[in-house]
């Protein structure tokens, strides 16, 4: 596209920016916004678009910016202590007793030494000692103090660089730097920080387009079709400005659910579509349902205080009917009627009564199995679970799990693998594989893994298996009844779907991050 045609496609703001840069050579976005009398946001969008088209180039420069500290604000308003002393001396005839002058100038005794030093250093006054008396003698009645000028300039501007101060005060930069150095030696007078400034300038291509900018701005053409143009027919006599459909616009942030909530809703939708019913259970659970009913021994490491949250109040929970409790006791001690040898220890009902914050949603599944009369049953649950984890990029003490079960007489291990493969396929993962695993309450047991293309690796996403007879038979199910079961970490799945490497980012309240995160379905 030739320079003239490109100029015709630019907005009025773009053209004015090019003209300004052609005249000034370079400018900051803030300077352009002030010159064009528009907000900084639209200027930044224009600069981004112009740079994308190769019409301008940008460069970032880092320099020190100064602002006043608490003492500096006081001195800017009331004057530096040495200048206040000069004013007092001038009013009393050029000489006075030291204590009297300090008092009238409002200079604390603790600052007397440093202030006298500045008086001598700047040649404003000298100390005279005579007959045991110490006096101050004025040497300069109307000093032009650069330090005070810098303080007042910073008070007016808020903050400024050496270059900006020199320009405002019409001084050499070297003179301003010396003043800043002196002021920096005086406690909390100045505060310095680094600031990065972006400057833009025209490229060779931009200079060619800028030559046509004034002419294009002066053209009398229609930039926006209005009702009066149609009503009066004036559109027939005028030229329409070319419309660039690729021109940048303000970003739109419509309302949306929290990204983690999106993932949870997608999981729920998929299981409902697959014919499952959703069930739920209490967050505060008895150790019986959380551990014992799942054939997890009472001395298992997962039940220790460093892994599980035990409650002080209520400290104990009620157990189900005695028949179920006794059957669970039997499978733990000697296997009961299951053919298993159990764990070979004396089961303690008191330990089973202890209350915990549930450590997994499998407790919801086993409660549901206790409540139903028999197969068939296809159920899932999604809920919060709690573990004593050290918080890091992949662990939280509170997180979500999804649990599912299929209770039937005519299902097998292959059905379990098929259900999981279909679920992950609907979640957007085409490649799924299973690795052998061990869990106390399932046999056979596997860990599903999905291939994550962006990382080029396989990622484990949960655990699955067939509930052992030691879990099902105490609940009243016949030996020919099979229960497929699985559980997965929702946050880990969400991290993959959303492209997040740190699990803590899912719970950040930073609005910018939440606005920019894609929805879960956007990455399918």
UniProtKB/Swiss-Prot annotation:
Subcellular location: Cytoplasm
Disulfide bridge positions per record: none
Gene Ontology CC entries for this record: cytoplasm
Entry's cofactor comment: Binds 2 magnesium ions per tetramer.
Catalytic activity: tRNA(Phe) + L-phenylalanine + ATP = L-phenylalanyl-tRNA(Phe) + AMP + diphosphate + H(+)
Primary location: cytoplasm
Molecular function terms from GO: ATP binding; magnesium ion binding; phenylalanine-tRNA ligase activity; tRNA binding
Coiled coil: none
Cofactor or coenzyme needed: Mg(2+)
InterPro entries: aa-tRNA-synth_II (IPR006195), aa-tRNA-synth_II/BPL/LPL (IPR045864), ArsR-like_HTH (IPR011991), Phe-tRNA-synth_IIc_asu (IPR004529), Phe_tRNA_ligase_alpha_bac/arc (IPR022917), Phenylalanyl-tRNA_Synthase (IPR002319), WH-like_DNA-bd_sf (IPR036388), WH_DNA-bd_sf (IPR036390)
UniProt entry keywords in alphabetical sequence: Aminoacyl-tRNA synthetase, ATP-binding, Cytoplasm, Ligase, Magnesium, Metal-binding, Nucleotide-binding, Protein biosynthesis
Any one of the GO BP annotations: phenylalanyl-tRNA aminoacylation
EC category name: ligase
EC number(s) reported in the record: 6.1.1.20
Gene3D superfamilies: Bira Bifunctional Protein, Domain 2, Winged helix-like DNA-binding domain superfamily/Winged helix DNA-binding domain
Residues noted as binding L-phenylalanine in the record, renumbered to the chain: 362, 441, 467
Family: Belongs to the class-II aminoacyl-tRNA synthetase family. Phe-tRNA synthetase alpha subunit type 2 subfamily.
Binding partners and assembly: Tetramer of two alpha and two beta subunits.
Official protein name in the record: Phenylalanine--tRNA ligase alpha subunit
Species the sequence originates in: Methanopyrus kandleri (strain AV19 / DSM 6324 / JCM 9639 / NBRC 100938)
Gene that encodes it: pheS
């Amino acid at each position: 596209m030739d320079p003239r045609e490109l100029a015709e496609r630019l907005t009025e703001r773009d053209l004015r920016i090019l003209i300004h840069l052609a005249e000034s050579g370079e400018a900051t976005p803030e300077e352009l916004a002030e010159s064009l009398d528009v907000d900084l946001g639209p200027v930044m969008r224009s600069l981004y678009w112009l740079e994308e088209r190769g019409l301008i180039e940008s460069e970032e420069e880092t320099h020190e910016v100064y602002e006043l500290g608490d003492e500096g604000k006081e001195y800017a308003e009331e004057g530096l202590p040495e200048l206040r002393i000069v004013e007092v001396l001038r009013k009393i005839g050029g000489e006075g007793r030291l204590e009297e002058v300090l008092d009238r100038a409002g200079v604390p005794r603790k600052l007397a030494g440093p202030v006298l030093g500045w008086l001598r250093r700047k040649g404003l006054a000298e100390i005279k000692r005579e007959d045991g008396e110490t006096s101050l003698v004025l040497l300069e009645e109307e000093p032009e103090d650069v330090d005070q000028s810098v303080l007042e300039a910073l008070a007016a501007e808020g903050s400024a660089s050496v270059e900006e101060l020199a320009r405002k005060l019409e001084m050499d930069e070297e003179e301003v730097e010396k003043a800043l150095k002196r002021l920096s030696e005086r406690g909390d007078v100045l505060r310095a920080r680094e600031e990065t400034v972006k400057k833009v300038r025209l490229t060779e291509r931009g200079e060619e387009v800028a030559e046509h900018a004034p002419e294009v701005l002066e053209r009398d053409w229609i930039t926006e079709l209005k009702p009066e143009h149609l009503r009066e027919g004036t559109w027939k006599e005028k030229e329409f400005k070319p419309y660039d459909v690729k021109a940048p616009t303000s970003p739109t942030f419509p309302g949306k659910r929290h990204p983690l909530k999106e993932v949870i809703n997608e999981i729920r939708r998929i299981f409902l579509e697959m014919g499952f019913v959703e069930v739920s259970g209490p967050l505060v659970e008895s150790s019986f349902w959380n551990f014992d009913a799942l054939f997890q021994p009472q001395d298992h490491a997962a039940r220790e205080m460093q892994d599980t949250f035990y409650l002080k109040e209520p400290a104990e929970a009620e157990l189900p009917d005695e028949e179920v409790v006794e059957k669970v006791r039997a499978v733990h001690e000697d296997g009961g009627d299951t053919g298993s040898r159990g764990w070979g220890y004396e089961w303690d009902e008191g330990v089973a009564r202890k209350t915990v914050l549930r450590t997994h949603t499998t407790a919801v599944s086993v409660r549901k199995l206790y409540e139903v009369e028999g197969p068939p049953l296809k159920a899932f649950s999604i809920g919060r679970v709690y573990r004593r984890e050290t918080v890091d990029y992949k662990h939280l003490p509170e997180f979500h799990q999804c649990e599912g079960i299929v209770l039937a007489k005519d299902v097998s291990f292959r059905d379990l693998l098929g259900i999981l493969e279909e679920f992950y396929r609907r979640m957007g993962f085409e490649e799924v594989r299973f690795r052998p695993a061990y869990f106390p309450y399932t046999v056979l047991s596997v860990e599903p893994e999905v291939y994550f293309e962006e990382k080029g690796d396989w990622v484990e996403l949960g655990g699955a298996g067939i509930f052992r007879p030691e879990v099902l038979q105490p609940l009243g199910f016949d030996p020919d009844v099979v229960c497929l079961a699985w559980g997965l970490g929702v946050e880990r799945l969400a991290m993959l779907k959303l492209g997040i490497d740190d699990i803590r980012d899912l719970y950040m309240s930073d609005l910018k991050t939440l606005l920019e995160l894609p929805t879960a379905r956007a990455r399918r």
